[in-house]
Amino acid sequence: MFTLFRWGRLFSLVATLLLASVALGQNETLPRTGQYWFDYDPTWKISERWSFDADASIRLINSDPFFYQLRLYPTMQFSPWKWMDLTGGVWFIYTNRFEGADLFETRPIIGIKVKKDIWRGIRLSNYLRMEFRIQRDLDANKTLTARRLRDRIQAMIPINHRSLSEDKTWYTFTDVEWFHQQDPEVDDGFNGRRRYRAGIAWRKNSTWTYQFFYGFQQTTSNLNRPLSNDEIFSFSLIHNIKQ
């Protein structure tokens, strides 16, 4: 049974994030977009320590002008200890900008995640990644490269159980992520970014999890582009495939 206390924590978390988003959006002179993300995230358990993730995503960005992205994130994960994951992969991103040149990005990444389960199944984690971005303008046949560092700190909180791994578990999560592009040449113009998310998920069983989050991000820009605020609405279907 859900306790009033745990639901209260969830509502307080979401309310705080919404209020912060409103505060960021009070300056009407800032460009503002709505983004809608849909993900199918299958993960294959190869062995006790190795797994392979192949997240596929479509992102609709309601900016001026409108554009969409198709993303594929094949990633290997090695877990030498229960509290640490090492990741590496090559991501692929196609951007259709309609009124501008289409883009294709190849993005090798490496990362390390450290995590700790604390009181009542609450899990804290820190996920640090380095990306090498290779972006090609498909109309002009130009290629730009940039390195980007990103760091995400997250808390996951089970609601109706004291573990995140039990069947029929509801849980909430919140995180903040910082992005720092070290070479501000890639065409998206994003020199720095902060992203805040809060969401809820239902772990049906060891195979299926359904996840929704609301987030907002604030982006600083190079190339003389203005600061922008973005609202994000995301739904993910997480599919754990046994060996």
Kindly give the residue locations of the regions a language model identified.
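Transmembrane beta-strands of outer-membrane beta-barrel pores
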Residues: A56-N62, V90-N96, K116, M130-I134, ...
